[in-house]
Design a protein with these regions (language model features):
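Conserved interdomain hinge at the start of the Helicase C-terminal
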Residues: 449-481
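Conserved helicase motor "Helicase C" RecA-like lobe of SF1/SF2 P-loop NTPases
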Residues: 483-508
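Conserved RecA-like P-loop NTPase helicase motor core
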Residues: 441, 446, 450-456, 509-608
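A substrate-engagement module of RecA-like helicase motors
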Residues: 3-126, 182-256
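Conserved RecA-like ASCE P-loop NTPase motor core of nucleic-acid helicases/translocases
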Residues: 1-2, 398-400, 475-486, 603-604
């Protein structure tokens, strides 16, 4: 949600701070997650034969760009958003640090590293602009406690709950398990690339410290029981290998057996509650837990040995070597915590449910193709860990948003906003303040509710969108609650509009990142843009380019297992109504971005409770 907001803040901050201080440092720094930045070691590997064919051309173009880039940000930065779409899907991702494989000071590019430069610059800055998830991940896993910010402002504060929800989640899935295997064992023999297992990364330590070497060997041997390449194919053919693949196979079978959609949701993931489990599945879960425990113990032992090597350092251990071992220790700690969370999740399968958590099985699918199977756990109230990890150590935290409070007939509902801020968990009474909007919505906006388009009538829905776009002469933002309907409407009307000189762009159809799509939309007043949730929040298109927002239906929350649990805890239909009101307010907020803006807000719903 926040890429557009980060660009906006970077532009606005230029009015308050100079580009650089007298000593050359930047007072304002944009900081993103590691997976957004170009990794120079991955680029070097790609240039030296890691990428072949068309992908090698991408590597050459990225190398040219890297020489001139402001900060090396490949996702939503100054790399053209369309470039990656001309090459294979994973091309851009393969050049970033997606998998926690960084060797820190052991890297020959450490001093020039874009990620490290951003981290060093943010330590000196007055203002660090980052997204919610990065702030939480750094608080939970940051290497240097002294560098953590003490005063935090969460803009778009209504997203903090969702960001905390995903940050403090646990998921034991096939994809996560195979990543752990690759981190410990290294890549499969036939794969290219510079990925190394533990043995290669810590070869010098293993040869110097016998106990450390034995721990590395034990961890690698135990990790061979994790899923390997081709695991999904083996499960689909009924031939799983190893304790975890056996477990995922049983999870998949049970999830399909309990699927209540009757094949209606063939293109989407399916899930089932963890209740009344067959004895065989519980037995498989215990075997999988033993396999995970066999990996965790040598990793803990290895962490202790690395600490001992640092304390009683040998003569050959220079500065970069010490930093590399520090980095390895940090990465080990993260994996040990992950394994402990997975073991706790598996122990729960045979026992009573924990009222603080919501657990479920899921088979993830995209366009009817399975891509992951696993066991998921979320906090019922994710603000509890958020309060402990982020709020408690901070000196001051501010949450700001136009939709923090729910608007009811009695006025603003501060009680719910305070609950969702996490403040009650640290027993602090927060200060609250509200400001009136500077815009005259009554005079500048008109709301239309269209009730004669039946739900599921795609030809009528597409016809309505085409008529609205033609009547407005472009400048329409269309928001959908389902990707399938978005694609169907786009397919029916794009040609018709193009013939009228009205270009139409769509998320999930045009292979361009959302930030670039919004830039194209902003620059062409005849263009229209169709999108989903990500466009409902944080998109800033002032002026003539956005004159009409069309909502394809009431934005009901999806009735997932997690949503049902929170709905039961949060007051039933009141909980749903609160979510819908906030989503409508956010969607309406896209329309009026300045005092001269005006336009229409249209909802297409036969059952809209107006």
């Amino acid at each position: 949600f926040t890429k557009n907001l980060q660009r906006q803040l970077r532009g606005e901050s230029a009015r308050a701070w100079p580009e650089r201080r007298e000593d050359g440092t930047r007072p304002v720094v944009v900081r993103k997650g590691r997976e957004n930045y170009l990794c120079l070691l991955n680029l070097e590997d790609a240039m030296q034969g890691g990428f072949g064919g068309r992908a090698a051309i991408l590597a050459q173009m990225v190398a040219r760009w890297a020489a001139y880039s402001r900060d090396g940000d490949m996702i939503g930065g100054d790399l053209p958003g369309w470039l990656g779409t001309l090459f294979r899907k994973r091309g851009i991702a393969a050049l970033t640090d997606q998998r926690g494989e960084c060797v820190y000071a052991g890297c020959p590019h450490y001093r020039k590293c874009f990620i490290e430069r951003a981290a060093r610059a943010s330590a000196q800055a007055d203002l660090v602009i980052a997204n919610h998830a990065l702030v939480m991940v750094n608080a939970a896993r940051g290497r240097d406690a002294a560098q953590r910010p003490t005063r935090i402002v969460f803009d778009e504060g209504h997203h903090v709950f969702d960001a905390a929800d995903s940050t403090f989640a646990a998921a034991l899935t096939g994809q996560e398990a195979i990543e752990l295997r690759r981190w410990i064992v290294g890549p499969e023999r036939k794969s290219k690339g510079r990925r190394r297992g533990l043995a290669a990364r810590l070869a010098d330590v293993a040869s110097y410290d016998e106990a450390g070497g034995e721990a590395v060997e034990a961890a690698i041997e135990a990790a061979r029981h994790l899923p390997s390449d081709g695991w999904l194919g083996r499960i689909n053919e009924g031939e799983p290998y190893g304790p975890l693949e056996n477990l995922f196979s049983a999870v998949r079978a049970l999830t399909f057996a309990r699927d209540e959609s009757g094949g209606q949701e063939a293109g989407y993931g399916i899930e089932t509650e963890i209740a009344d489990l067959p004895g065989q599945l519980i037995e498989l879960a215990q075997q999988a837990a033993s396999a995970l425990s066999a990996i965790r113990h040598p990793l803990v032992k290895l962490g202790v040995r690395l600490e001992a090597v640092l304390e009683d350092a040998p003569d050959w251990l220079d500065g970069p070597g010490r930093a590399r071992i520090e980095g390895a220790r940090h990465s080990l700690g993260w994996r040990v915590d992950l394994l402990a969370a997975w073991e706790a999740l598996l122990e729960r399968l045979g026992g009573p449910a924990d009222p603080e958590f919501v657990d479920w099985f899921a088979v993830d699918r995209s366009d009817a193709r399975e891509f992951d199977i696993g066991i998921h756990r979320r906090w019922l109230d994710p603000m509890k860990p958020f309060a402990k990890v982020v709020l408690e150590p901070a000196h001051g935290v501010m949450l700001t948003s136009a939709t923090l409070t729910d608007r009811t007939d009695e006025g603003a509902d501060w009680e719910d906003a305070i609950t969702r801020s996490g403040a009650p968990h640290i027993e602090v009474a927060p200060l609250t303040t509200a400001a009136e909007s500077p815009f005259d919505y009554t005079a500048r906006a008109e709301v239309l509710i269209v009730t004669d388009i039946k739900r599921g009538d795609l030809p009528a829905l597409a016809g309505a969108y085409a008529r609205f776009i033609e009547a407005a002469g472009g400048g329409v933002l269309g928001l959908f609650t389902a990707i399938r309907r978005l694609r169907a409407v786009y397919g029916r009307i794009a040609d018709r509009l193009a013939r009228s000189g009205l270009p139409l762009y769509a998320q999930h159809v045009d292979p361009i990142d959302t930030g670039t799509l919004v830039d194209i939309f902003r620059d062409d007043r005849t263009a229209s843009l169709l999108g989903t949730d990500a466009l409902r929040d944080g998109v800033d298109v002032p002026g003539e380019s956005l004159r009409c927002v069309v909502l394809e239906g009431v934005p009901w929350p999806r009735p997932t297992i997690l949503h049902r649990a929170r709905r039961a805890a949060g007051g039933g239909s009141r909980h749903d109504d609160r979510i819908i009101r906030a989503r409508l307010a956010q969607a309406f907020g896209r329309l009026i971005r300045g005092k001269d803006d005006k336009g229409h807000f249209i909802v297409l719903s036969p059952a809209f409770p107006s």
